[in-house]
Each structure stands twice: as structure tokens, then as C-alpha cells.
């Protein structure tokens, strides 16, 4: 298997008003995956090594936009929206070929986040809301492949929705206690 990966990334941050800034992250990513010839797997019906011949490429544009607002030196709110992609792994290709399924698709994530954070010298706390909407997400099927690895397959539509809460206490310089819950 041969995998090539190329990406270009840029980020811009602009302060509109004192304490209010916006950012834009942009990434272009190209991934190529090529598999040729026999593998280590055996077709036990004819005692021949299984041949995988495939050549796939993926072009991803992954933008992220957001706003940060420092209400006071101790209080901050933020909002962001991002699109991210993930290419299939070698295992995804091999397992789909073995099961005679269509080729796996790239995963696409639309991610919206809103948050609040309080910070002082001794105590920090934050609450963050997230909504992650997937297209063709890779999820575990509960199946195991021939060598004992967990199998994942594309699911057409799925989402994650939740709140994360975190806090930290640093009463002295040499000790910090962090807790979080999702």
C-alpha cells in the first residue's frame, strides 16, 4: 500500500474591537491511496493470495470560522463552525473488498461549538456546547476481521450533540487539579 498526503494550511485572526476577534483557518488536503497486487490474506477456497488493486484519491477543503469575545479579563465566550474530512484507512478498503461491498467513502463532519470560560489565577471553569453532524461517518460494526481487528463501515448520517464542562483549581504553583465531564 502506498499513501501520499499533501496539505496547505493558513490562519488569519482579526480584532474588530477591543476583546472581539474573528479567525479563519483554511486547509486544503490531498490524499492518495494505492494498493496493488497480492496481500498476506489467503482465499482458502483456492489457496491463493487475495489481490487488491485500487487507486483512490481524496481532495478535502477544511475551513474553520470563529469568534472570540473577552467580556472582561476573566470571562470569555466563543463560537466556531468547522468542516473536516477523514479518508478511509487501509483496513476500510480491505474489509470492504473482502465483503464485496462498495468502496468506502470519505467521512465529512460539520462541527458547531459555543462556549464560555471563566479564568482567574487560582480557578478556571468552562462550559461548551457542541453539535457534530456527520456524513458517511466511520462507525464500529461489532464485527472482527480475519486478523482480529475491529471493522468500521460508513454510516450515511449520524450526529453527536452534547455539553462539556471543565474546571481546574490551582491553589499553589506546584499543584493543579483538573476535572471535566461530557
Model segments located where?
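Generic preference for hydrophobic/aromatic residues in regular secondary structure cores
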Residues: 1, 35, 138, 152-153, ...
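Extracellular/periplasmic, surface-exposed regions of secreted and cell-surface proteins
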Residues: 11, 30, 138, 152-155, ...
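Gram-negative outer-membrane beta-barrel transporters
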Residues: 18, 131-133, 153-182
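A short local structural element in Rossmann-fold oxidoreductases
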Residues: 90-91, 139, 176
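Surface-exposed, extracytoplasmic segments of Gram-negative outer-membrane nutrient-acquisition systems
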Residues: 134-154
Amino acid at each position: 500500500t502506498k499513501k501520499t498526503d499533501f496539505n496547505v494550511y493558513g490562519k488569519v485572526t482579526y480584532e474588530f474591537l477591543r476583546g472581539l476577534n474573528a479567525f479563519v483557518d483554511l486547509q486544503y488536503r490531498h490524499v492518495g491511496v494505492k494498493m496493488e497486487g497480492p496481500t498476506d490474506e489467503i482465499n482458502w477456497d483456492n489457496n491463493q493470495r487475495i489481490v487488491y488493486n485500487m487507486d483512490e484519491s481524496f481532495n478535502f477543503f477544511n475551513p474553520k470560522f470563529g469568534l472570540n469575545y473577552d467580556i472582561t479579563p476573566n470571562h470569555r465566550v466563543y463560537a466556531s463552525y468547522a468542516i473536516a474530512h477523514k479518508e478511509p484507512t487501509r483496513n476500510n478498503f480491505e474489509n470492504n473488498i473482502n465483503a464485496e461491498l462498495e468502496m468506502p467513502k470519505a467521512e465529512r463532519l460539520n462541527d458547531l461549538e459555543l462556549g464560555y470560560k471563566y479564568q482567574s489565577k487560582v480557578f478556571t471553569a468552562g462550559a461548551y456546547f457542541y453539535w457534530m453532524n456527520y456524513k458517511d461517518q466511520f462507525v464500529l460494526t461489532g464485527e472482527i476481521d480475519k486478523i482480529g481487528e475491529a471493522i468500521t463501515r460508513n454510516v450515511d448520517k449520524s450526529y453527536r450533540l452534547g455539553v462539556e464542562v471543565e474546571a481546574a483549581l490551582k491553589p499553589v504553583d506546584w499543584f493543579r487539579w483538573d476535572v471535566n465531564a461530557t
